[in-house]
């Protein structure tokens, strides 16, 4: 038995193949959009504390948020503090110039002038972070209320 395929059969097969490729590509693009990591930063100083203090300390936070697992990977550098770090926290929800409770303690042993770690956020914490309602605060014995502070903002 001889089977022949007409031009219409090849056209239909080609269209089905094209549709499958496009569907797979769209699905991959949707997955990329929902798991795209978000970069954050903060510039810390004593003038951002509430109330302001005269600290000469400075700091910088860099963080990456992964929405697929709500994980925040952060790196904190600082210098010029009045003494060793006694504690550091993410606070929120709050905008610049407003104090807020601790949202997430940075439970790390701060050695030298920097630290790096990662934390998993709750849905509410992630929403506050993404909305720019978090700040990071570094405490020392001389300034236990906070020596340097910086608002956490998206790094464009």
What is each residue range found by the language model?
Residues 1-24:
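Sec-dependent bacterial lipoprotein signal peptides
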Residues 2, 22, 26-88, 92-156:
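Metal-centered catalytic cores of metalloenzymes
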């Amino acid at each position: 038995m001889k089977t022949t395929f007409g031009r219409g059969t090849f056209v239909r097969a080609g269209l089905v193949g094209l549709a499958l490729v496009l569907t797979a590509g769209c699905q991959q693009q949707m997955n990329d959009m929902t798991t795209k990591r978000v970069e954050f930063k903060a510039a810390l100083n004593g003038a951002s504390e509430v109330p302001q203090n005269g600290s000469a300390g400075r700091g910088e936070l860099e963080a990456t948020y992964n929405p697929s697992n709500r994980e925040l990977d952060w790196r904190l550098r600082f210098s010029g503090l009045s003494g060793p770090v006694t504690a550091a926290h993410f606070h929120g929800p709050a905008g610049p110039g407003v104090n807020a409770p601790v949202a997430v303690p940075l439970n790390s042993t701060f050695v030298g002038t920097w630290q790096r770690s990662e934390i998993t956020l709750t849905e509410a914490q992630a929403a506050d972070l993404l909305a720019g309602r978090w700040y990071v605060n570094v405490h020392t014995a001389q300034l236990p209320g906070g020596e340097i502070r910086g608002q956490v903002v998206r790094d464009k």
